[in-house]
Swiss-Prot record:
Family indicated by similarity: Belongs to the UPRTase family.
BP GO terms, sorted: UMP salvage; uracil salvage
Gene: upp
Class of the enzyme per the UniProt entry, highest EC level: transferase
Keyword Nucleotide-binding among UniProt keywords: yes
EC numbers for this chain: 2.4.2.9
Pfam families: UPRTase (PF14681)
Cofactors, names only: Mg(2+)
Name recorded for this polypeptide: Uracil phosphoribosyltransferase
The protein's role, per its UniProt record: Catalyzes the conversion of uracil and 5-phospho-alpha-D-ribose 1-diphosphate (PRPP) to UMP and diphosphate.
Binding site for 5-phospho-alpha-D-ribose 1-diphosphate: R85, R110, D135, P136, M137, V138, A139, T140, G141, Y142, S143, D206
Species, as recorded: Burkholderia orbicola (strain MC0-3)
NCBIfam families, per the entry: PRK00129.1, upp
Length: 216
């Protein structure tokens, strides 16, 4: 994992397998089915990185031979919250890794000025829970900021929030950092820039359309 000196809260997971799979996702000729499978696989691989610092305690267990104090995740419970709609494609990968996690949903769409409009919030109980927000793209950054706002307004501490995306534009990362410098943002790639239509370049295209096989 590496960082960019411009963005202290940004962490880039540069594992070769992740980069290999991301290249195939970028390919405009990749089928909907393959795109969906790759999104799930990359999210699973990124999950290992973003959960590496979860607090650990010990639990007494009986093996077939002896009793031993073995490591387990301490206390806090996990919740996966995809930002609809494209974030749904990432939640399965994280659930493969942590099948006991609760799942919430935050629904937003982009208005003509690219600002997020909220239409749905469904969350599990908040107490002592670590939230992993997921959305394949951080383009303008407004939807990501809004998703974190939803949790902070409900008194979820910043230390209990992580945001994971596949690709991000520097413009969006700056917006996210300005709004939430205390929340970690994990991505597989920091791309070049946003174009005049607020699409990430080189990016993936419209992740939701490619994931579900729809046309914008």
């Amino acid at each position: 994992m590496k960082q960019d000196s411009r963005f202290p809260n940004l962490f880039i997971t540069d594992h070769p397998l992740i980069q290999h799979k991301l290249t195939h996702m970028r390919d405009k000729d990749t089928s909907t089915r393959t795109f969906r499978e790759l999104l799930r696989e990359i999210t699973l691989l990124m999950g290992y990185e973003i959960t590496r610092n979860l607090p650990i305690t010990t639990k007494r267990v009986e093996t077939p031979l002896v009793a031993v104090d073995a490591p387990v995740i301490a206390g806090k419970k996990l919740a996966i919250v995809p930002v609809l709609r494209a974030g749904i494609g990432m939640s399965d990968g994280l659930l493969d890794l942590v099948p006991s996690a609760r799942v919430g949903h935050i629904g937003v769409y982009r208005a003509e000025d690219h600002r997020p409009v909220e239409y749905l919030v469904r969350l599990p109980d908040l107490e002592d829970r670590i939230f992993i927000l997921c959305d394949p793209m951080v383009a303008t950054g407004y939807s990501a900021v809004h998703a974190v706002d939803v949790l902070k307004r409900r008194n979820v501490p910043a230390a209990n929030i992580m945001f994971v995306a596949l690709v991000a534009a520097p413009e969006g990362v700056q917006v996210f950092q300005d709004a939430h410098p205390d929340v970690k943002l994990f991505v597989a790639s920091l791309d070049s820039h946003l174009n005049e239509h607020a699409y990430i370049v080189p990016g993936l295209g419209d992740a939701g359309d490619r994931l579900f096989g729809t046309k914008n």
